[in-house]
């Protein structure tokens, strides 16, 4: 086992603080509408330019192991805030830096670190309550656009597109962000349920120009096993022909004779038909087939339930106003399912989302909710160069996360003002001793740090701005760094999601509290230069001629 280097007391804390400051100083230049970019070196390709706090934090590794430990702990603040709220990583980093810096000063002055931490926790809980009380629901898509714009560093176009997408797919809809090949940023919305399985044979195509199969007022047969022969289905197919409606078969697979028979019937014009594979795999496939059944008012023909193809009747088939099938995707629009049943299914999937511990499962379950309840929108981000597209995509991702958070827990005044106003709730709060009171004072001072940083990035004196806002009785009064004006932040459209601000403070206080109470640090000793590698052979001389 390698020898360890151990640091204690002031030496350990100073090294740790240096690491915290190095990382936080690199991240905080991105804060606010006039925040700057950070350029990140890539091992291959062009450097990446970003204003996303967590992307900057993730790139930083320091040479000194003790400093690096401090930096990594603050990186954890940014990562946790990003995971929980999806935005607010820079705010969280600035708060953590301020709490750690002030806290370590007090520890150096002889105060008890544990009592300081208790005071910090006490103050944080009080401020979080105040933030929750200040939050108000998002009224309309204009406010959604404002939240998106602020999070995208003042680019109104991004905010507007996210608001449009959310309006179209609803709060339950899924919005994904992709890179676009062109210059423009555009939004595509898919209404109805779409899944990534296309037609099994190009002979099913009805629109030769677009190479799509389009079925209007269509019947849908859902079968969870493979279809290799149509013999058991003949009575059903005869009824379908009499009804003169098109039929879509969704099954695990349709192969061999069954597929050939369907194609021949389609070409002869006797039967308007198409077949696609069922989406998903294993248990997820069963669940998705059941979703389609509920959406279209049909039943899944499943051997688990003792159903056979021979006994399928017309009332077991689902129906939909329109179905469009390309070679890669199937879209079912306006299924005939009962609204109450669809809502019950959505509630059931939501309960599974609450219980699951896997991020992958959660994402897939949320997609299923969106397909049943809302729809799916794709924002394709464009730009002149690849570097610009990646930088804009970072901002669109942040803005999207911020708008989702705003819909969940409401909005508060932005620009760091809410934290300063919430800090007024600490007046009169006292701990059980003077050291805890010092912890409360640390949080009160730290709450001004994001506001000061936003002002300083805009080239204005942060202390003056913080003083003006502190003195104001109006809770919405703040400083708009974009226009450098004072006034009502709601009327300026400078608003933040309550969830983002709350999460940033909770995560910053949690990890800063751990750093303040650190008394010793242990790291591997660096290997001495020129030391022989362990286990090497003493002499390999005289073997130079061997190839």
UniProtKB/Swiss-Prot annotation:
It catalyses: ATP + H2O + a folded polypeptide = ADP + phosphate + an unfolded polypeptide. It is an enzyme of class 5 (isomerase). Coiled coil: none annotated. Residues 528-547 are annotated as: Disordered. PROSITE patterns: CHAPERONINS_CPN60. Keywords: ATP-binding, Chaperone, Cytoplasm, Isomerase, Nucleotide-binding. Forms a cylinder of 14 subunits composed of two heptameric rings stacked back-to-back. Interacts with the co-chaperonin GroES. This is Chaperonin GroEL. It comes from Ruegeria sp. (strain TM1040). The gene is groEL.
């Amino acid at each position: 086992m390698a020898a360890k280097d151990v640091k204690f007391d002031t030496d350990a804390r100073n090294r740790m603080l240096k690491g915290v400051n190095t990382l936080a100083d690199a991240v905080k230049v991105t804060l606010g509408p006039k925040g700057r970019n950070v350029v990140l070196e890539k091992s291959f390709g062009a450097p990446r330019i970003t204003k996303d706090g967590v992307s900057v934090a993730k790139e930083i590794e320091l040479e000194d192991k003790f400093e690096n430990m401090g930096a990594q702990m603050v990186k954890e603040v940014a990562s946790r805030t990003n995971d929980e709220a999806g935005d607010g990583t820079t705010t969280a980093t600035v708060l953590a830096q301020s709490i750690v810096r002030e806290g370590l000063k007090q520890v150096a002055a002889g105060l008890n670190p544990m009592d300081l931490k208790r005071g910090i926790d006490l103050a944080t809980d009080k401020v979080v309550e105040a933030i929750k009380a200040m939050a108000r629901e998002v009224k309309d898509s204009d406010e959604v656009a404002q939240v998106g714009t602020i999070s995208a560093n003042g680019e109104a176009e991004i905010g507007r597109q996210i608001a449009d997408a959310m309006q179209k797919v609803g709060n339950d809809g899924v919005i994904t962000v992709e890179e676009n090949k062109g210059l423009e940023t555009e939004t595509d919305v898919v209404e109805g349920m779409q899944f990534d399985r296309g037609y099994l044979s190009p002979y099913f195509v009805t629109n030769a120009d677009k190479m799509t199969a389009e079925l209007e007022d269509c019947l849908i047969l859902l079968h969870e096993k493979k279809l290799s022969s149509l013999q058991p289905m003949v009575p059903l197919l005869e009824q379908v022909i009499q009804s003169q409606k098109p039929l879509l078969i969704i099954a695990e697979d349709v192969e061999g004779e069954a597929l050939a028979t369907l194609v021949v019937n389609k070409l002869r014009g006797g039967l308007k038909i198409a077949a696609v594979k069922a989406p998903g795999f294993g248990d997820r496939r069963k669940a998705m087939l059941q979703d389609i059944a509920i959406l279209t008012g049909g039943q899944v023909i499943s051997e688990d339930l003792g159903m056979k193809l021979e006994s399928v009747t017309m009332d077991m088939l689902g129906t939909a106003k329109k179905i469009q099938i390309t070679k890669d995707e199937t879209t079912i629009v306006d299924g005939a399912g009962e609204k109450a049943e669809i809502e019950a299914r959505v509630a059931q999937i939501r309960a599974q989302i609450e219980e699951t511990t896997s991020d992958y499962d959660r994402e897939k379950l949320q997609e299923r909710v969106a397909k049943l309840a809302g729809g799916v929108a794709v924002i394709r981000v464009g730009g002149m160069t690849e570097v610009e597209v990646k930088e804009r995509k970072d901002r669109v991702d942040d803005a999207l996360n911020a708008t989702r958070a705003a819909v969940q827990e409401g909005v508060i005044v932005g620009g760091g003002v809410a934290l300063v106003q919430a800090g007024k709730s600490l007046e009169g709060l006292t701990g059980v001793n003077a050291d805890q009171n010092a912890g409360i004072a640390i949080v009160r001072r730290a709450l001004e740090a994001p506001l000061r940083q936003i002002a300083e990035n805009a080239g204005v004196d942060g202390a003056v701005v913080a003083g003006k806002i502190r003195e104001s009785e109006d809770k919405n009064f703040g400083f708009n760094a974009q226009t450098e004006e004072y006034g009502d932040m709601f009327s300026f459209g400078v608003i933040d999601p309550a969830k983002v601000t709350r999460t940033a403070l909770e995560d910053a206080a949690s990890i800063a509290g751990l750093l303040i109470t650190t008394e010793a640090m242990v790291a591997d000793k660096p290997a001495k230069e020129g030391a022989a590698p362990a286990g090497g052979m003493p002499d390999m001389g005289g073997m130079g001629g061997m190839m």
